[in-house]
Every structure is written in structure tokens, then in C-alpha cells.
């Protein structure tokens, strides 16, 4: 029985005969005195035995028993009510110390890895927003095996090292991130967390990794390190059905450009920092493509050029305004209506009609067909390689939304799969088709341009009952979208669940769903809630609903809820129910940079050089490297207030008297040290 590690203390003795000369003895004895650890029936502790996830849950909940509940428990299918650790697992989940695996499994008997034990502790204690990740650039100096740290866990390694929580025996230069944590390891980690909390005194040990021994890049003389306000502030711009842009098909190029500039000017005025523009609504293209025809939503005729490249134009105009550009693709939809427009080659309905099915009035590509999988990959990678996009974005359309009494017509390819020896059920096969596509895209994008972000905005309900009380469409079974798996496998950089429901809508409650999405985020990706300004009607949906929803998103920042994306731009343009006024006066009063992604890049750019001040004008020059923009801060008491975000081409600013700092921002939104100047 391995359950002797924690929960209650059955002996008043704090000594175990097999730890007398063990490196972890002081940590073990200290925790035993607190009633956190106990030994086996034979009196031994067995410090080098590995720890299971169930045992770890028991230790954590005993040690940090005062941490408040942060989310509702969703019972795991492999943790029965009568299991010895069910209560501990439930509490560890509710307090965000630990999460599960895809398909609602917990795997209680799996051994917990050292890095995941550390990740669990900092998640439950909310350390991600309290401890600096400044050691990220020097992890390779600290740990000889830094290359073995999974990308998702690098911030964990930096935070726990900075907090003095990492203890490594016999060699503190090895983190051994993926090794199973031993009882001794866990004892040391937990004790060091108590030291960080101020609840225990430090124990001298040569195996504690001392962060002060390593050089972190320091700001140059006359400079200052500033932690900027960060929040993802995005808006969707839909082209399908003439939703947001252009206002109608067939407009002259100049008018199309003017309309898009009007949208971007409004977003800039409201201090948004990201645009998600639909560039492939139905197997077509709002850009020059050798793979697919020009979209009829642009010109009224599929295949007809609008006379310019809207994608290239949109990217350029966004970057002038310090707005990130994310290209939005619909992967499988071939036509919103087979009657609406004549498809022309190279539309897939013309080149490969055998893999395009009529479903209701729509045309839909078969996600299981290799020609479709290759087409999607080639189309998206073509954009990644040829255009200066900041992100690639997929929405909620995978397999089509179901039509009553109408099955998706892929019985023949599924039968062929089974005849070839495939064993997956139809539902699992369909989900696997989508998974293959997403994983391939994730790898391809990172290989081609590692700075390009990959995000998905799935339907806001994963499955009814997850979490408890939630009702609605089962995206897992109806759309074959296993968004929980994508997030937990780390196949994306951000997820933007479409939470188009009110806070008081019990069966689809906004805060309940958002907390659930943040709770399953074991790879520590970013969560940007999708909000609907399109629903504002002054009746069931009033302006204050959006205000409260943004507040809820911000309250979950420690759980990596780091922004919002609004559907859609037309509602913002119209100032529907006064929401635009509210953005300006309350929600987005101050500028903010987009959030950084430590698993992609953490290297700060060079600071600006030749910074001078004269006649209320500050001028500067680039210090080298690729710069996306500049930030200008003004000092107020002991705080630095972000005054302006300027495009890279602008290297001067006229200001009022005061003390300022100018910083460089790279394309991943990493910020340099600020160069201080006084006027």
C-alpha cells in the first residue's frame, strides 16, 4: 500500500530509520512534524520510491489546506467514489493544483514527473503572476539538461528556480524534468514552497538551486526594466455572408480599402491590439493564391481578382497601427450554398468533386480524405510562408453543425478505412481526422515560422455536463472537435472558446464555462474568451453584460485568461447599445501590449539607442534586430505609465515635461529595457 505518504500522521515520531543519512532528511522530518508526511507500517519512509498522481494530490491538499476553491469538480471516469484518494483528488482539482487528461481521465496511478509536480504547486499557489520568469533566457546556463524541459514547462522551470523551489540531488545542475518525482523530491519541493510562502524557515542544502548564482541580462546604464500592461484585445472581421467586410460584393478596390481602414481606425482608437480577418470562408481566398480561387464575397464572381491583394493590404495597415494580424481560415466548408455561386477551378469542388459532399444546402469537404488534408495544409502554409501574418486562426467549423435527420455522407470512406484494418468507431475516426490536421498544422507553422501564433476558437461548450450543470450542443460528438485534447496536447498557442451566453444563463453560464476552459489548460497556453457584441439588443443583452464578462475574464488572469476577442467588428463600428463608448471610457482606457508566449520566445530585443530630448521632443534610433514597435512610458511617482505604442517607422514623440522611458518591442511582444530621458 503506497498511501502512507500523507493525509494523517499516525506516529508522533518524526524520524524514519531509512533516512538517517539521506539528503532529504531535514525536509522530510520538517514535514512529518507538521503532520503532512508519515511512513509505512514497518516504520520506514522509503524516500526513493516514486509518487503517483493520487499520492501527490493527497500531499498537496494536506499541505495547502487553506487554499480556497476556484472551480467546480468534474468527476473523473477512472476515480470512483470509493477510491482512497477521491477526496484529495477532488480538492486538488477544485483548487487548481492538478488537472486531468483528455476524455476526463485522471490516471491516479501514473507516476508524476518532477516538472509536473512543480507546475502543480505554482498553479495552485497562483505563483505565475507573482514570480518573475526572468530566468527563462538563462535556463541553459542553470541546467545542463535544459533542452529536455518541455516548451510548456519552461516558464515553470524559470518561476520555481527563481522562487528557490527546485531541489536536485545528486547534481543541482540537472533538473531531470521528466523523471518520476520521488518521495524525497516531493518533500523538498513542498517544503521549499512553504518557505516561499513564509510559513517555514529555510533549510541549508547544497542541492537547492540558487538563482542568485546566475547572470540575468541587466538593463544598460541609464535604463529601467518595465513590466508593461498586457492583454489580448481582438476583434473578428467576417467576410462570409458580407458580415463585416466588405459591405457588399463587387465594390471597387478603393472603396474596399476605405472600408477596411475605417474598421482599423476604429479599433486603433479603442486601443485594440489584434484583428482576426476571415481570409478563406469557403474553399476560396481573399488573397492571391495558386491553390484556390478569388472569393466571390469580394467581387461577386468566384475567381475574379479585386485588383489588389486584400491580405497584403490588411497586414500592412494593421502593423501601421500596432495591431496584430491573424489570418482566419475555415478548413472544411466548401460553400455556404451550392446554389449561390458558380465554383471555378482551382476550387476543390471543381478539381476533386469526389471529396466534396452536399450537406443540406451547403458543400462540405471530407475531413478524412487525404486530398482534403493536403489541400488545407498547403493553403495555410502558403499564407504562413508568403505573408507577414502574426497568427493563424481556425474557428468552430470542423465537421458541419448537424442537421436533424441528416447524416454526414462519409459512409464510403469510413467503410474503406474499416476494410483496410482500421478499428476506430465512426465518431473516433472523425475526431482523429481533425486531430491529424491540427497536429500537422501546429508542427508545420512552428517549423516554417516559429513566431507565428496558432489559435482556435471552438464552440464554447466542449460537452454537456463538463462542467456539471452545463447543457447544449455536444461539440465533441456533433462537430467531432476534441478541443480539450488540442489544448492539453499543446497543439495551439491560444484557445478562444466562443462563450456567446450571458452570465446568468445557468445552463451555459459565461463564468462557469470560462473557469472550466482555464482549468483544463495543463500545457499553460493562453485563453482568450470569445464575446458577442452582436447579441446586444438592449433587452436580454445589455451593454453591462459585456462589461461584466470582461471583468470576469480579467479576474481569472492567474489561470491564464489573458484577453478577449469580440464578435464582431460591425457591432463595434455601429456602437451597438453604446458598447464602443464603454470600450473607450471604461474597458480599454489605457493601451496594452499583447501577451507574450514564453514557450515560443523570451529573448528581449536591444534597447533603442541615441535617445535624445530637446524642445519637448524625444528622438531615438533602433539598437539592432527586428523591431515591431516602440513603447513610450511616463513616470508617475514610482510607476511607469504606458503613454503610447508607436509603429517601428516612427522614432520620435512630442511630449509634455516629465521623465520618460523608450522601449523596443519585437514581433513576439517582448520588450527591451527602457532608456530613460527627462524633459
What are these model-derived regions, one by one?
Residues 3-25, 33, 38-54, 60-88, ...:
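Feature responds to low-complexity, polar/acidic, surface-exposed segments characteristic
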Residues 227-232, 238-258, 327, 332-386:
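Active-site-adjacent "subsite" loops/lids of carbohydrate-active enzymes
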Residues 258-284, 386-390:
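Catalytic domains of carbohydrate-active enzymes, especially glycoside hydrolases
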Residues 270-306:
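Aromatic-lined carbohydrate-binding/catalytic grooves of carbohydrate-active enzymes
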Residues 280, 321, 351-461, 465-491, ...:
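Polysaccharide-binding and catalytic clefts of secreted carbohydrate-active enzymes
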Residues 480-506, 518-600:
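Substrate-binding cleft of secreted/luminal carbohydrate-active enzymes
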Residues 615-626:
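Conserved aromatic anchor
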Residues 653-671:
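Beta-strand-rich modules
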Amino acid at each position: 500500500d503506497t498511501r502512507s505518504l500523507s493525509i494523517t500522521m499516525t506516529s508522533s515520531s518524526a524520524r524514519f530509520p531509512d533516512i538517517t543519512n539521506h539528503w532529504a532528511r531535514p525536509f522530510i522530518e520538517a514535514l512529518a512534524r507538521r503532520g503532512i508526511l508519515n511512513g509505512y507500517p514497518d516504520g520506514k519512509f522509503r524516500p526513493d520510491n516514486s509518487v503517483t498522481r493520487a499520492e501527490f494530490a493527497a500531499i498537496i491538499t494536506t499541505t495547502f489546506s487553506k487554499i480556497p476553491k476556484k472551480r467546480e469538480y468534474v468527476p473523473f471516469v477512472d476515480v470512483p467514489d470509493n477510491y482512497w484518494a477521491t477526496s484529495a483528488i477532488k480538492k486538488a482539482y477544485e483548487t487548481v493544483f492538478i488537472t486531468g487528461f483528455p476524455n476526463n481521465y485522471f490516471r491516479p496511478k501514473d507516476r508524476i514527473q518532477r516538472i509536473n509536480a512543480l507546475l502543480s504547486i505554482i498553479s495552485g499557489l497562483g505563483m505565475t503572476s507573482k514570480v518573475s520568469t526572468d530566468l527563462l533566457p538563462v535556463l541553459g546556463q542553470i541546467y545542463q539538461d535544459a533542452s529536455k524541459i518541455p516548451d510548456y514547462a519552461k516558464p515553470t522551470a524559470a518561476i520555481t528556480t527563481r522562487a528557490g523551489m527546485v531541489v536536485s540531488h545528486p547534481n543541482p545542475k540537472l533538473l531531470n524534468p521528466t523523471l518520476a518525482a520521488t518521495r524525497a523530491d516531493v518533500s523538498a519541493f513542498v517544503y521549499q514552497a512553504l518557505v516561499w510562502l513564509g510559513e517555514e524557515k529555510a533549510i541549508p542544502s547544497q542541492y537547492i538551486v540558487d538563482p542568485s548564482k546566475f547572470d540575468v541580462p541587466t538593463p544598460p546604464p541609464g535604463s529601467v526594466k518595465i513590466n508593461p500592461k498586457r492583454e489580448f484585445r481582438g476583434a473578428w472581421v467576417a467576410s462570409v455572408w458580407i458580415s463585416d467586410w466588405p459591405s457588399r460584393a463587387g465594390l471597387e478596390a478603393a472603396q474596399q480599402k476605405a472600408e477596411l481602414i475605417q474598421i482599423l481606425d476604429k479599433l486603433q482608437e479603442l486601443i485594440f491590439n489584434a484583428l482576426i480577418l476571415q481570409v478563406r470562408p469557403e474553399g476560396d481566398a481573399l488573397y492571391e493564391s495558386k491553390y484556390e480561387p478569388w472569393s466571390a464575397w469580394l467581387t461577386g464572381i468566384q475567381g475574379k481578382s479585386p485588383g489588389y491583394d486584400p491580405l497584403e493590404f490588411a497586414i500592412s495597415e494593421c502593423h501601421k497601427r500596432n495591431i496584430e494580424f491573424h489570418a482566419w481560415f475555415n478548413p472544411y466548408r466548401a460553400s455556404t450554398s451550392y446554389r449561390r455561386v458558380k465554383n471555378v477551378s482551382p476550387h476543390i469542388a471543381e478539381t476533386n468533386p469526389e471529396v466534396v459532399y452536399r450537406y443540406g444546402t451547403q458543400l462540405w469537404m471530407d475531413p478524412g480524405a487525404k486530398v482534403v488534408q493536403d489541400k488545407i495544409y498547403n493553403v495555410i502554409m502558403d499564407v504562413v510562408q508568403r505573408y507577414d501574418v502574426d497568427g493563424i486562426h481556425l474557428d468552430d467549423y470542423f465537421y458541419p453543425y448537424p442537421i436533424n435527420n441528416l447524416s454526414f455522407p462519409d459512409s464510403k470512406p469510413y467503410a474503406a478505412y474499416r476494410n483496410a484494418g482500421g478499428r476506430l468507431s465512426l465518431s473516433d475516426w472523425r475526431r482523429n481526422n481533425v486531430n491529424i490536421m491540427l497536429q500537422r498544422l501546429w508542427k508545420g507553422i512552428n517549423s516554417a515560422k516559429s513566431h507565428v501564433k496558432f489559435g482556435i476558437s471552438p464552440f464554447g461548450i466542449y460537452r454537456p455536463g463538463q462542467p456539471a450543470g452545463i447543457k447544449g450542443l455536444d461539440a465533441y460528438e456533433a462537430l467531432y472537435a476534441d478541443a480539450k485534447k488540442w489544448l492539453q496536447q499543446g497543439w495551439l498557442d491560444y484557445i478562444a472558446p466562443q462563450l456567446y451566453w450571458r452570465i446568468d444563463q445557468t445552463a451555459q453560464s459565461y463564468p462557469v464555462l470560462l473557469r472550466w476552459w482555464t482549468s483544463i489548460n495543463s500545457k499553460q497556453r493562453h485563453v482568450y474568451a470569445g464575446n458577442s457584441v452582436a447579441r446586444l439588443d438592449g433587452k436580454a443583452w445589455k451593454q453591462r453584460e459585456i462589461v461584466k464578462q470582461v471583468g470576469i475574464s480579467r479576474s481569472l488572469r492567474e489561470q491564464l485568461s489573458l484577453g478577449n476577442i469580440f464578435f464582431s467588428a460591425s457591432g463595434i463600428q455601429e456602437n451597438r447599445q453604446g458598447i464602443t463608448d464603454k470600450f473607450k471610457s471604461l474597458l480599454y482606457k489605457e493601451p496594452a501590449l499583447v501577451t507574450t508566449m514564453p514557450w515560443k520566445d523570451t529573448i528581449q530585443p536591444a534597447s533603442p539607442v541615441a535617445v535624445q530630448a530637446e524642445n519637448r521632443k524625444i528622438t531615438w534610433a533602433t539598437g539592432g534586430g527586428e523591431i515591431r514597435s516602440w513603447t513610450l512610458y511616463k513616470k508617475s511617482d514610482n510607476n511607469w505609465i504606458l503613454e503610447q505604442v508607436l509603429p517601428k517607422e516612427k522614432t520620435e514623440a512630442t511630449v509634455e515635461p516629465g521623465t520618460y522611458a523608450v522601449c523596443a518591442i519585437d514581433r513576439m511582444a517582448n520588450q527591451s529595457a527602457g532608456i530613460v530621458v527627462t524633459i
